[in-house]
Structures are given as structure tokens and as C-alpha cells.
Amino acid sequence: MKKILVIGGGAMGSAFTIPCIENKNIVTITEPYSKTFIRNLSSKNKFHSALKINLPKKLKFRKFSDNLLKEKFDLIVIALSLSGIDFIGKKLKFLKIKTSILVLTKGLKYEKRNKKILTISEQLKKNYNVSNISILKGPCLAKELARKNQTNVIVANKSIKKAKQISKMISTSYYLIEFSKDIIGIEVCSAIKNIYSMIIGAGQSLNASSNLFQKSVMEMKYLTKYFKGKDETTLGLAGVGDLYVSAAGGRNSKMGSYLGKGFTFKAAKKRFMPNDTVEGEQLAKEIAPFILKKVNKKKIPLMVSLLRTIITNKKLKIKV
């Protein structure tokens, strides 16, 4: 029995607590940004509005604080949005937290000063001196995990032994875990698939989308290698696996369908998805300054088209 702290009360962070508790751990969840989160979920039924389920009775809810972070946990799980990484990084550095960290957040950061793309683990290590980081990625829809549907993910750490120790804490008969040392490749794949799922969604037929899927995989393979990741990672759970789930029906794919019909991003967002977060858009704006200047555009024409569509708010034009 281990003590696990999950930081982030959104759909994924909350769903993640379910296999952790089922594995007989003592699990606490906290939310830094929502003052009403703890109050709402501390009620008798613990109903989560995004997941549409009652969270486990044994799940503990705590107000986010420095004192909470300083308590003794065996694992701290970061399930915040990308914008929350700097916030939690500063907290972990200031409090000199040495507990094992598991990052669920997906995304990349453009460091303007050094004109370099950083993965989340690189951001935490370089900017905030956070060590002992593992990452968890793969094709996982929060609602399906919450319903205990079979879910396969991958934990990456330079030490496979460490990855297996974490797996032992959180895996169940339905939450199945693979291992990898390719931290960079897995983080790159899990981020850029949001952009490529928009591109695939832009196909106006299954025939067109399948062609875009194939070309997207080839571009993902090129970009993963460009950032020093491994080829095989693109073809694994964090690459093709996660891309399939996102393209099959996620928010990025949905936005892509509107772009494919001739809407600009802003027009589609305002008309059809005003309350939805489109991760691919956030990532596109983050990495465009680097990708459009540093990477061979001939190798990634789909990526280039989508980035230009987002940053200029013009109609999507794809040549295949």
C-alpha cells in the first residue's frame, strides 16, 4: 500500500485515481486552480461532472497547499494542463520535493530565450531542478478509464526498473502498462498527435482521412527523430496508438472537420466549440516559431499547413 498524491482534478487526473485506489493505495487528489473543486467533490456521492461518474469513496480530497506537498507521499502525479507546469515546477523547486514524480500532462514548450523546444520533463528538470521524473502517455480517454475499459499506456524512465516500480503501484487488470527509456520520443509523439489529429479530421471521407493518417505518421516519425526520439516510439502506444484515439473522435479531430469544410479556426471555435479546449491549437501557437524556422518544411508539409492555418487564421489548404 503506497501513498499517492494526484495534482489536477480534471477528467484525466480524476479518472487516474480509480486504478490507483483499486490497487489498494491511499490516494489523495487536489486542484490548485478551482476553489469549488474540493467542496463539490467532497459531497457524499463524489460526482464528477466531466466523467459523469461517482468517484471512489476511499478517494481523499485536500485543498492545495505547500504543506500538502511537503507531506510524505510515495508518488506525486502531475495531471495539470500545460499552462500549469510552470506553476507546479516553481512549487516543487521551492519546497525541494524529492518524491518520485509521474507526469500525465501532454505538450511541448518553446523556450524563446534559447530558441529551443523543451519537453515537459526537460522543462521541469532544466528550469526547476526537479529530478526523479517518469512520464505516462498513450491512448487513454478519461471517460473510458473511469468506466474501467481496457486501457494500455506506457511509462517512460531512463531506468526501466523505476518504470516498473511505478507500474506496480498503478496497474490493474484493465489498466495495462508498457515500459520505455525513450522519454523524449514519447513526449514528442504524445504532443504532436494533437496537431495531426486535426489534420486527419479535415479529411471529408474515410478514404481521404486514411491517406492523411498515413502521411501524418510519416511526419511524426520524422519529427520524433529530429528531436532525438526513436523511430519505434512513433509506431507504439504514444505515437500511432494515441493518434488513432484522437483522430477517431477527440476535440482536435472535431475541429479538424470544420477546418476541412472551409471554416477558419476562429470562426469554427466561436460557432461550434466555444467552450471546448483544443489542445492542438495551443500547441500549434507554442511551437510554430520554432518549426517554421528551424525544420525542413518539405519533410512536414501537413504540419506546416496546419500551423500557418492556426497562426494566420486562414482557411486550411492541404496538398496531398
Where would I find each of the regions flagged by the language model?
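Internal alpha-helical scaffold of NAD(P)-dependent oxidoreductase catalytic cores
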Residues: 91, 126-132, 150-233
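Rossmann-like NAD(P)(H) cofactor-binding subdomain of soluble oxidoreductases
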Residues: 55, 62-66, 71-147, 166
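NAD(P)-dependent Rossmann-like dehydrogenase/reductase catalytic/cofactor-binding core
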Residues: 55, 193, 200-201, 225-235, ...
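General beta-strand structural signal in soluble alpha/beta enzymes
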Residues: 103, 132-137, 177-181, 235, ...
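Short beta-strand/turn micro-motifs composed of small residues
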Residues: 8, 30-31, 103-105, 137, ...
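NAD(P)+-binding Rossmann beta1-loop-alpha1 motif at the extreme N-terminus of oxidoreductases
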Residues: 1-55, 59-64, 70, 121
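Conserved active-site and cofactor/substrate-binding residues in soluble primary-metabolism enzymes
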Residues: 7, 11, 15, 36, ...
